[in-house]
Amino acid sequence: MSERSDLLHFKFENYGDSMLQKMNKLREENKFCDVTVLIDDIEVQGHKIVFAAGSPFLRDQFLLNDSREVKISILQSSEVGRQLLLSCYSGVLEFPEMELVNYLTAASFLQMSHIVERCTQALWKFIKPKQPMDSKEGCEPQSASPQSKEQQGDARGSPKQDSPCIHPSEDSMDMEDSDIQIVKVESIGDVSEVRSKKDQNQFISSEPTALHSSEPQHSLINSTVENRVSEIEQNHLHNYALSYTGSDNIIMASKDVFGPNIRGVDKGLQWHHQCPKCTRVFRHLENYANHLKMHKLFMCLLCGKTFTQKGNLHRHMRVHAGIKPFQCKICGKTFSQKCSLQDHLNLHSGDKPHKCNYCDMVFAHKPVLRKHLKQLHGKNSFDNANERNVQDLTVDFDSFACTTVTDSKGCQPQPDATQVLDAGKLAQAVLNLRNDSTCVN
């Protein structure tokens, strides 16, 4: 017997960094460069494999366009895009603080998630957690006297009493020349907490979530969200009217703002955001977004739509940002999703790959097929796919019929027993499949 030889295992420390340095040197010497990325008026030469690994957006562009030049256009300066591409080689990105939002937006366009994550973390340091008693300095105390409480009960949630207090943060005061302006919005719930502590017993007995969480919410925030989150909070709080109902001191949400679909919880307390996975309800958008992370849901902070996958949220954010990275080479029309581009190409090629399995009509666009199924047949795409599977499994039972050719003696041969049994089982299976496919829950 041969003795078992021992395996030698070598692990080279910092091997990846050294390889990137060598590839960057080759790029600087313009050796083995197989692509040129044109960012408006700036050319960036490099290697497809490096750019594709660092930017999923460029990876898709390389797959769609097998040429040595790729043109992209970003809203920010061309130098911002150039620095982002060079960081794929060096792993280092350095820029002034006032350019943070520009780099965050450009990195989101290029789908460089590692840079988006770090920029989001850096952006959070400008948002300072509010102090518990800051509202006393800038806002009039509403609970100073019993008379103010009586006026509050008569006012029924007047805008003057319920309007939020806005204080510029210290960082924004120091950065007057910067493009970044951070404001800290104190919610109406905090002001009402200063007015009366008795109302706290009527709130839901759940663990409170901080309004300004120190944990980065990069999984829920895309490039355009950070720029508008303060504006959304302010508009949301201005429209959120609270009122007291007599001596019971029950806080009610204004139905004129949120409509009749608001659900009440705990003695008339009504909220705005309800978790689709559990019974928790939230008044503040930030708390609701933090809670959704527990269910592995990702929410758009602009429209409130939730997604089960982070990539779907990123594709959804392109619609809000107006980003359309997929362009038709024939007519130049751009699209926000690759599937929309592929559907559009059917117009140029004349292909109609989408077929209705109920009437054999074909369509170039899938949305047209869905509309056809709903209006004419009362079906959906899932039913249409099941109908196709049933048709594929439909068997010509005549092929299982025994041949009746007469032999030389004038006798007809009898069919094989196993052949008849198999045909019977197959016929029953097809009938069962048809019954299952037409079952409606």
UniProtKB/Swiss-Prot annotation:
Cross-link (Glycyl lysine isopeptide (Lys-Gly) (interchain with G-Cter in SUMO2)): K184, K255, K329
Tissue: Ubiquitous.
Polar residues compositional bias, start-end: 201-216
Molecular function GO labels: DNA-binding transcription repressor activity, RNA polymerase II-specific; identical protein binding; RNA polymerase II cis-regulatory region sequence-specific DNA binding; sequence-specific double-stranded DNA binding; zinc ion binding
Main location, first listed in the record: nucleus
Segments passing through the bilayer: none
UniProt record, GO biological process: negative regulation of transcription by RNA polymerase II; regulation of cytokine production; regulation of immune system process
One family name in Pfam for this protein: zf-C2H2
Keywords for this protein: DNA-binding, Isopeptide bond, Metal-binding, Nucleus, Repeat, Transcription, Transcription regulation, Ubl conjugation, Zinc, Zinc-finger
CDD domains: BTB_POZ_ZBTB26_Bioref
Domain BTB: 33-97
SUPFAM superfamilies named in the record: beta-beta-alpha zinc fingers, POZ domain
Chain ranges of zinc fingers (C2H2-type): 273-295, 298-320, 326-348, 354-377
Compartments it resides in: Nucleus
GO cellular component: nucleoplasm
Region (Disordered): 134-177, 194-216
Function: May be involved in transcriptional regulation.
PANTHER family with a match to the protein in the record: AGAP004733-PA, ZINC FINGER AND BTB DOMAIN CONTAINING 12
Protein name from the UniProt record: Zinc finger and BTB domain-containing protein 26
Organism: Homo sapiens (Human)
Name of the gene encoding the protein in the UniProt record: ZBTB26
